[in-house]
């Protein structure tokens, strides 16, 4: 594409391409907290200065799945500052926007909204950091989309089949088919490609007249047999692929000789890990497209914090370092000090004339101390550079290469993976879980749960703060195994049950689709549980709080009028009774007061424990419960089980006193001969101190306690 063609704006699309901005990364750090916001400001300023038609983002606009208010506020502030205005948009949308943006409440491009004044549209897919989660499957990009600042596209609504429908753009005689695919777990997407479940739809008319641009956010480098997306999986009619997620900047388009399309990897806009791939200079791209021709102009970012990295191997310097020398540690420190000073001098030299670049650089010196050397204290050494570098705590990284042993089986060298990360990537949580169980001894292997399910549950817990993910996965797989055993009618022998559990687990592992369904169902349960807890937490209104305060005040008045006794007894005589002759009720149930039609709901701190213990029984207990008929002995046993869970010696210290009302009831009832079931129920009454905290205690009960 010639220079004259590139400057012909009438028929030329000008697109600013960026990816992996990671807004909010280390926002609480005193030195690096504003780095991502400053870089986004520079990117948007470049877009406005070059008068681009639109901005194209390749995912991970946010670093956290639930960005902070500061991060969201700053992002909206910058988008409003640079992307709104009176400059007209020169291209039009030809495709059905209800299909392209069908998951949005406003299924049309933002610059065509009559209530908004957009001068630079932003099109973005979601990445693995800011992907949709929760019961409603929302992400931070949906907030920006609802506010009218970002056009979120490339979202797949199905986990079984993906149809990628392009956004069709036209400017003059140039037509672009913009395809997008937001981040999907690599193994799942790999399997869908293999099973031909991914389809890229093409325009029906004049297929060859469209420039096909595809934006994807997946692993490009190989992390495992299926934990990446090979370039050969993509359709060969594509002209250019914008590949997000990989942080090393390889923005110059490279040709895939097999598929004959070009791939541009813009890389991250900020340093998020001290790895070799991040040390490459950061750029964004100004993509010009006219007809079927393109040109990618690299634009360096001047506000990115400098990052210098160097490796040294102590064993390669036998003339300087001798592990038998008692002063070898001092020699190593002096050598490292010299290397770091050299990197700081290079940083100062490169920063000359660029006042927009942060003053303190990132420095990482990796030291291989193989060969009998010992590492020194990094914390003490780094004190010398606190005021000169942005990362003094991890300025030096010690590692060593272990000798390769004869492999008796498949083993994972974690030291090699950690000390030599591949091209700017880091290990993922689910990979570590899988690798751990692959190399673990037999006695610590999972026998009921699956490694893949546990890996994804841990990932949801760590990356997306789904606190119930692990618990719900365990419950779901346990329930499914219990149902399987009940349907098989196996004898209640431990050996046979273990064998059936092992066979059932192996069959599930072979059926990957079934395992996917299990994980999805467990994650859906966890998200629904979180949504319910959030709704219940916000259900109390001001009137509820006032009623709680009133109940507490009345209960406090009752306690003040009745002197407390020093009796520490438990069981009979403890808790609210509401008068003599009242029927006892088990904890967590309801009790009916004398001469009243009102039911008072009773609560206990231990009620949840009792219910949970009875519900989450073991496999053998669950199996036995279906084989035995209920009897009186079974009922008595159930009471003893609840007592065993609820009772604890610590309760005596928590509730050391009882009121005179309790003593009066106790003295009256002690003369009676109580049955075993009555004794079991007696321990379930709440103490008077629980009344102070119970906002649902009715007024009649409070009055009886006063009398």
From Swiss-Prot:
Protein name: Double-strand break repair protein MRE11
Known partners and oligomeric status: Component of the MRN complex composed of two heterodimers RAD50 and MRE11 associated with a single NBN. The MRN complexes dimerize on DNA to form joined MRN-MRN oligomers required for DNA double-strand break repair. As part of the MRN complex, interacts with MCM9; the interaction recruits the complex to DNA repair sites. Component of the BASC complex, at least composed of BRCA1, MSH2, MSH6, MLH1, ATM, BLM, RAD50, MRE11 and NBN. Found in a complex with TERF2. Interacts with DCLRE1C/Artemis and DCLRE1B/Apollo. Interacts with ATF2. Interacts with EXD2. Interacts with MRNIP.
Keyword field contains Magnesium: no
Principal subcellular localization: nucleus
Cross-link (Glycyl lysine isopeptide (Lys-Gly) (interchain with G-Cter in SUMO2)): 255, 416, 624
Region (Interaction with NBN): 87-117
Chain intervals with Acidic residues compositional bias: 643-654, 686-695
Pfam families in the record: Metallophos (PF00149), Mre11_DNA_bind (PF04152)
UniProt-annotated binding residues for Mn(2+) 2: 60, 128, 217, 245
């Amino acid at each position: 594409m010639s220079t004259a063609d590139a400057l012909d704006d009438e028929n030329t699309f000008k697109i600013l391409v960026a990816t992996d901005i990671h807004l909010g990364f280390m926002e609480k750090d005193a030195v690096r907290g504003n780095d991502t916001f400053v870089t986004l400001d520079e990117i948007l300023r470049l877009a406005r200065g070059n008068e681009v038609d639109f901005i194209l983002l390749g995912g991970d606009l946010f670093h956290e799945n639930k960005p902070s208010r500061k991060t969201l506020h700053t992002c909206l502030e910058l988008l409003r500052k640079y992307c709104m205005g009176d400059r007209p948009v020169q291209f039009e949308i030809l495709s059905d926007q209800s299909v392209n943006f069908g998951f949005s409440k406003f299924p049309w491009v933002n610059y065509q909204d009559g209530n908004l004044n957009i001068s630079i549209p932003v099109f973005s897919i979601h990445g693995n950091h800011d992907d949709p989660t929760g019961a409603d499957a929302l992400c931070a990009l949906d907030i920006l989309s609802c506010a009218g600042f970002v056009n979120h596209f490339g979202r797949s609504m199905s986990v079984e089949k993906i149809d990628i429908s392009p956004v069709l753009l036209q400017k003059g005689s140039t037509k672009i088919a913009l395809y997008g695919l937001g981040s999907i777990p690599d193994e799942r997407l790999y399997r869908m490609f293999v099973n031909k479940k991914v389809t890229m739809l093409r325009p029906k008319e004049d297929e060859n007249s469209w420039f096909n641009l595809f934006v994807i956010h997946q692993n490009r480098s190989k992390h495992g047999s299926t934990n990446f997306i090979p370039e050969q999986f993509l359709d060969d009619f594509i002209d250019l692929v914008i590949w997000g997620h990989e942080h090393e900047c390889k923005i110059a388009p490279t040709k895939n000789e097999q598929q004959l399309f070009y791939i541009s990897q813009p890389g991250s806009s900020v340093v998020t890990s001290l790895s070799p791939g991040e040390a490459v200079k950061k750029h964004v791209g100004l993509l010009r497209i006219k007809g079927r021709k393109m040109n990618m102009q690299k634009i360096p970012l001047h506000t990115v914090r400098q990052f210098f990295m160097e490796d040294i191997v102590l064993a390669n310097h036998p003339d300087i370092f001798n592990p038998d020398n008692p002063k070898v540690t001092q020699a190593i420190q002096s050598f490292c000090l010299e290397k770091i000073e050299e990197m700081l001098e290079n940083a100062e030299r490169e920063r000359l004339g660029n006042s927009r670049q942060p003053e303190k650089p990132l420095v990482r010196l990796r030291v291989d101390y193989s060969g009998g050397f010992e590492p020194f204290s990094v914390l003490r050494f780094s004190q010398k550079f606190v005021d000169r570098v942005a990362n003094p705590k991890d300025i030096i990284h010690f590692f060593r290469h272990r000798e390769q042993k004869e492999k008796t089986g498949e083993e994972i060298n974690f030291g090699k993976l950690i000390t030599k990360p591949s091209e700017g990537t880091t290990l993922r949580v689910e990979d570590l879980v899988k690798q751990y169980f692959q190399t673990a001894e037999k006695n610590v292997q999972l026998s009921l749960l699956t490694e893949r399910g546990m890996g994804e549950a841990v990932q949801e817990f760590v990356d997306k703060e789904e606190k119930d993910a692990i618990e719900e996965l365990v419950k779901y797989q346990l329930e499914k195994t219990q149902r399987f055993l009940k349907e098989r009618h196996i004898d209640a022998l431990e050996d046979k049950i273990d064998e059936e559990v092992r066979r059932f687990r192996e069959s599930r592992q072979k059926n990957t689709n079934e395992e996917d369904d299990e994980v999805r169902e467990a994650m859906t349960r966890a998200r629904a549980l979180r949504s319910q807890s959030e709704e219940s937490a916000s259900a109390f209104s001001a009137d509820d709080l006032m009623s709680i305060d009133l109940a507490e005040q009345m209960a406090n008045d009752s306690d003040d009028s009745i002197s407390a006794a020093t009796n520490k007894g438990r069981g009979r005589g403890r808790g609210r009774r509401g008068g003599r002759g009242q029927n006892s009720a088990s904890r967590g149930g309801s009790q009916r007061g004398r001469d009243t039609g009102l039911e008072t709901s009773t609560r206990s701190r231990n009620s949840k424990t009792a219910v949970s213990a009875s519900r989450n029984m073991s496999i053998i207990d669950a199996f036995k419960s279906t084989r035995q008929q209920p009897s009186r002995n079974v009922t008595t046993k159930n009471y003893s089980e609840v007592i065993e869970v609820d009772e604890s010696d610590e309760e005596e210290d928590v509730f050391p006193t009882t009121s005179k009302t309790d003593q009066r009831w106790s003295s009256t009832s002690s003369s009676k001969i109580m049955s075993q079931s009555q004794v079991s129920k007696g321990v379930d009454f709440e103490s008077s101190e629980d009344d102070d905290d119970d906002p649902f205690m009715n007024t009649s009960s409070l009055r009886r306690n006063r009398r």
